[in-house]
């Protein structure tokens, strides 16, 4: 049997936990990242205890000095958890007591439970983590916008069902990947409204009888408010699930971008050439240049979806208030952040380094009769009902297929035979440039509209960058 050395509980137990229980309970291998936040919160808690008359000035100053010394040692790596420490809180209490003695060091726990403590620290860590992730997302948005700005007139085949559909601007397609990422950033900004509520002062679940001031410590720690319900404050992890969803959504959005890059870089498509610094080779095939970054992005999205699903499954049947199940809440979130911090710089660099083969894209843009919709809409503008126009455009496609030519290569007589309304003037829209320019509506692919969109994305990114600073 082990003793309860390194734990924050004891007294009513005649002995320590079994070795198996101690090993199962141990969390310093992942929760040590909370140490700086724990020390910051302990400084604030010291001041709350002092203002409540529970510490003298001398005791306050002694605790603060001990915490400052411990923080320095944690920062430079000279202090860390021991194998006997159950968690980050126990390790830091041991470090504080080593510096100020058990009488003074033991006073810091008054009015504070690990239940409200860890809930607060998790929120503090996560509020910082989402900002780091957001910076990486902004870098990907910036890379997409820069590539769009560099190719204002390049035309490519737009696709639905991975089949050629209509010509669009390459810039329009690239910005279609930027918009979801901007929405993810909006979610991060909105998330902070709910994450910025402090559980401190809630104790184990019922609050404190020591006259502490939850609002004061909330303000000291940068929270916007103290929790309204102590039971909810210690038990709630919806903020963690919300963050895990945003992280998973970012990964899914990156995965869709990655899929385009993978397909576009294939020999069959040939839309992009990968830069040597952002691709890998084969151990046996000398000619290969593989889109590993994009493939890892696609793979990691499943990992982050799994982290979200696992966290929700952990939360789904817990009675109020705190349960030890919640030790399992942090690793999925920590992992999602770690994966995004690896992935986002790589994706930003990959996008920025792509070389677009604009001539090939332009050559392929009319393939697959992508101008058929333009023909039908031209007829509509001449007063033909759309049902009839659709039929005529389909007949024109069939005629072109039979001859093995493009729509623009049908003769005037062939067009007139399909529909008398198909006069030679229809050729004005049977070019990829004419098709793109005609879609001059809000959100459309016309060059002027895409330029407006590019400006709006730049403004939105700058607004979000300002909102994420605190």
UniProtKB/Swiss-Prot annotation:
GO terms for biological process: arginine biosynthetic process via ornithine; L-arginine biosynthetic process. Pfam families: ASL_C2, Lyase_1. Keywords: Amino-acid biosynthesis, Arginine biosynthesis, Cytoplasm, Lyase. One of its GO terms (cellular component) is cytosol. GO terms for molecular function: argininosuccinate lyase activity. The keyword Cytoplasm applies. It comes from the Bacteria. It catalyses: 2-(N(omega)-L-arginino)succinate = fumarate + L-arginine. Signal peptide: none annotated. Its EC number is 4.3.2.1. Disulfide bonds: none annotated. Pathway: Amino-acid biosynthesis; L-arginine biosynthesis; L-arginine from L-ornithine and carbamoyl phosphate: step 3/3. It is found in: Cytoplasm. HAMAP family: Arg_succ_lyase. Belongs to the lyase 1 family. Argininosuccinate lyase subfamily. This is Argininosuccinate lyase. It comes from Mycobacterium tuberculosis (strain ATCC 25618 / H37Rv). The gene is argH.
């Amino acid at each position: 049997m082990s003793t309860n050395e390194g734990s924050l509980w004891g007294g009513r137990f005649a002995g320590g936990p079994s070795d198996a229980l101690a090993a199962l309970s141990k969390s310093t291998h992942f929760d040590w990242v909370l140490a700086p936040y724990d020390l910051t919160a302990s400084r604030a808690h010291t001041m709350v205890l002092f203002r409540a008359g529970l510490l003298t000035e001398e005791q306050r100053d002694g605790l603060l000095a001990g915490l400052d010394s411990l923080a320095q040692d944690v920062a430079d790596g000279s202090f860390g958890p021991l194998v006997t420490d159950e968690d980050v809180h126990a390790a830091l209490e041991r470090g504080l007591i080593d510096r100020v003695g058990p009488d003074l060091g033991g006073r810091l726990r008054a009015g504070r439970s690990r239940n409200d403590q860890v809930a607060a620290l998790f929120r503090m860590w996560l509020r910082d983590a989402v900002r780091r992730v957001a910076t990486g997302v902004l870098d990907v948005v910036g890379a997409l916008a820069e590539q769009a700005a560099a190719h204002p007139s390049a035309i490519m085949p737009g696709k639905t069902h991975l089949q050629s559909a209509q010509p669009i601007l390459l810039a329009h397609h690239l910005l279609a990947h930027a918009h979801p990422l901007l929405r993810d950033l909006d979610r991060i900004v909105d998330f902070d409204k709910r994450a910025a509520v402090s559980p401190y002062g809630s104790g184990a679940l019922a609050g404190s009888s020591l006259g502490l001031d939850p609002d004061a410590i909330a303000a000291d720690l940068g929270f916007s408010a103290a929790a309204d319900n102590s039971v909810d404050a210690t038990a709630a992890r919806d903020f963690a699930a919300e963050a895990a969803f945003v992280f998973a959504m970012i990964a899914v959005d990156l995965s869709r971008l990655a899929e385009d890059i993978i397909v576009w870089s294939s020999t069959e498509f040939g839309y992009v050439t990968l830069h040597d610094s952002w691709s890998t080779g084969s151990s046996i095939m000398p000619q290969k240049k593989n889109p590993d970054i994009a493939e890892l992005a696609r793979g990691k999205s499943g990992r982050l979806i799994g982290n979200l699903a696992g966290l929700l499954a952990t939360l789904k049947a817990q009675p109020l208030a705190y349960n030890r199940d919640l030790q399992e809440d942090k690793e999925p979130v920590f992992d999602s952040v770690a994966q995004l911090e690896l992935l986002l710089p790589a994706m930003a660099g990959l996008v920025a380094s792509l070389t677009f083969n604009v001539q090939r894209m332009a050559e392929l843009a009319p393939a697959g009769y992508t101008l058929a919709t333009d023909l039908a809409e031209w007829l509509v503008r001449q007063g033909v009902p759309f049902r009839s126009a659709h039929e005529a455009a389909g007949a024109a496609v069939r005629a072109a297929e039979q001859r093995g030519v493009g729509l623009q290569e049908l003769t005037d007589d062939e067009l007139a035979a399909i529909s008398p309304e198909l006069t030679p003037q229809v050729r004005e829209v049977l070019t990829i440039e004419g098709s793109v320019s005609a879609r001059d509506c809000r959100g459309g692919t016309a060059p002027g509209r895409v330029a407006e969109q590019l400006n709006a994305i730049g403004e939105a990114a700058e607004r979000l960058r300002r909102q994420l600073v605190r």
